[in-house]
């Protein structure tokens, strides 16, 4: 590459453009708000969040769960949140016995209860193991929030809230997903333990 500076700037510009599109979409902003309110309601009722994804989306699931359990902006009691992507014994047992497509559905069946919130992350919206988990959420009356790319894929029909990032580029979608996850964490933390804190630039 002859001009790496321009290449780097192009990536930043593309990422900023996706976020600007979200910022201008009032329906999408309202959807993020309403999804956050469902998480708050669940926690106020003594429930928990369950999160899942594959690859980079698995990392996002673990990242968001970590913010809930540990802390986000300030010290406060931990909030119950489980990333369904972390226990290698459970993952390999389910994968071996029931197939990869049941990796998360089996855990939702075992650990989820009515009133919990499941956050499924899939850039395509078509990850089979996420879709299977979403189907199980409907059976158990677990609220479902999906984070996807522009089309929403099959998640459109299965999620209570399908938050679709306006991009078809996987890295740009993932960058927006973690920002949305951070925003949800901030709203939940502030509502439950309100200290009025944020890190303004």
UniProtKB/Swiss-Prot annotation:
Residues covered by the SIS domain: 39-198
The keyword Isomerase is assigned to this record: yes
Protein localization: Cytoplasm
UniProt-listed Enzyme Commission number(s): 5.3.1.28
Keyword field: Capsule biogenesis/degradation, Carbohydrate metabolism, Cytoplasm, Isomerase, Metal-binding, Zinc
Principal subcellular localization: cytoplasm
Cofactor: Zn(2+)
Bound cofactor: record note: Binds 1 zinc ion per subunit.
Reactions catalysed: 2 D-sedoheptulose 7-phosphate = D-glycero-alpha-D-manno-heptose 7-phosphate + D-glycero-beta-D-manno-heptose 7-phosphate
Signal peptide (from-to): none
HAMAP family: GmhA (MF_00067)
Protein name: Phosphoheptose isomerase 2
Lineage: Bacteria, Pseudomonadati, Campylobacterota, Epsilonproteobacteria, Campylobacterales
The gene coding this protein: gmhA2
